[in-house]
A protein has these predicted regions:
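Catalytic domains that recognize anionic headgroups
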Residues: 1-303
Length: 303
């Protein structure tokens, strides 16, 4: 039986890859994976695309939307890929930084599960002696969910305020944990490894030197979180900086997924391993006068 490595990202646009997009993003690791090892699916129907409904589809093997929405996995039915593979003799491991998986019970059914805490205002440790500063203007970002009058962008940067270097970024930490797991378990096949990166979901806070490569002339406040509304709420330079933060975070994700793919290569696992790289959805960064994952508004043209 072949090993299975499932690599999930969140909010990773398909046109980040290769030369598919009008605004190029550097994704050398995934581009090489597509060329050398992968079958790329370019014509498809999306399933339940929000974070937990999407992963519920993957875990259960059936489409949940519109029969049920965002809910704990146990409420969606009995099937669970980890339990099914475990019954066939697979060792099963979940490694994630996505803050919603453990809340929805996805760790149940795995032999072992590990989460890096603190993504997207996941309040694992409070620092209330230190005030929560404004990460970006409130009128330029998503207003809810709100905590103590602070936006998600504010909460995220406050909780992770000591994280400045690349090694401290979530994609780096989670991928490093996956690399270590492969080194410590590759001699014990078959295994199922589910690695779940929440990046490049907003807030987009990669090292600013990476952002500068996409937007070297910008001198305003960093635009790290979209407003889930009209793109016209931003100036042209702010909107470009918003995209630059997203692009840099997507590049960072590519780099650290690349470290997992490189370790699979180092351990000579390709012939015995099915590797799946996927994402739940993309995001708007100015297209159709929207940023984020926005609803259709009453004032929108329906034709």
């Amino acid at each position: 039986m072949k090993n299975v490595v499932l690599l999930i990202t969140d909010t990773f646009r398909y046109d980040n890859l290769k030369d598919y997009g009008e605004r190029p993003v550097r994704t050398p690791a995934l581009d090489t994976f597509m060329d050398d090892h992968a079958t790329s699916v370019s014509r498809f129907y999306t399933g339940s695309f929000p974070t937990i409904p999407h992963r519920t589809d993957l875990a259960r093997g059936v489409l949940g939307w519109p029969h049920y929405g965002w809910q704990p996995l146990v409420q969606s039915g009995p099937n669970h890929i980890a339990r099914i593979l475990g019954a066939q003799g697979y060792a099963t491991q979940l490694i994630c930084d996505c803050p919603h998986l453990f809340n929805a019970g996805f760790q149940s059914g795995f032999d072992a599960a590990f989460q890096h805490r603190g993504q997207e205002a996941d309040k694992h440790l409070l620092h209330l002696n230190h005030p929560i500063p404004e990460a970006m203007p409130a009128e330029k970002t998503r207003r809810s969910p709100n905590w103590r009058g602070k936006t998600l962008a504010d909460q995220h940067r406050w909780l992770n305020r000591y994280y400045e270097t690349e090694a401290e970024m979530f994609s780096a930490k989670t991928s490093a944990t996956a690399v270590r797991w492969l080194e410590e378990n590759y001699k014990a096949p078959p295994f199922f490894l589910w690695v779940d990166l929440f990046d490049p979901h907003e807030p987009w806070d990669p090292p600013e030197y990476m952002v500068d490569r996409y937007d070297p002339e910008y001198s305003g406040e960093p635009m790290i979180h979209c407003n889930y509304g009209h793109a016209t709420d931003y100036t042209e330079t702010e909107l470009h900086n918003l995209w630059a933060h997203y692009a840099a975070e997507a590049e960072l994700v590519d780099r650290h997924i690349g470290s997992i793919l490189q370790k699979i290569d180092d351990l000579a696992l390709w012939d015995d391993t099915v590797v799946i790289v996927t994402s739940d959805h993309g995001t708007s960064i100015g297209e159709h006068d929207r940023t984020g994952k926005s609803n259709i508004n009453d004032a929108d043209d329906k034709e």
